């Protein structure tokens, strides 16, 4: 099963550390993929769920494409990634956009399932702990509490 640290969280949310470069690296160093929130502002990329928090360079993303799940927080951000053929074709960046959609399809064709949608075969269950969901049919889990699924 693919285990994805939601904003870098592994054993419960730590809001002040979420979507920060050191926290993301710590989650990966612990052996997990990481879901990050990215937004485009003034032609620069920033980490941050509700607002632009910390600038992130494309070079940083390019070195981590095999374990990052990039949640584009705005349509403009999604369009930026979609129109960057280098990021997708050469680096195979995995990105997606969703807000309250039941499902989203990532650029690598993974089904990203909104909380409350399980059991859904071969999907990524997002925050299944919110609804005590059955993840037995999932290929992955994106959670604040990954230790529960190890």
Give the predicted meaning of each segment.
Residues 1-150:
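Phosphate-group recognition and catalysis centered on beta-loop-alpha active-site segments
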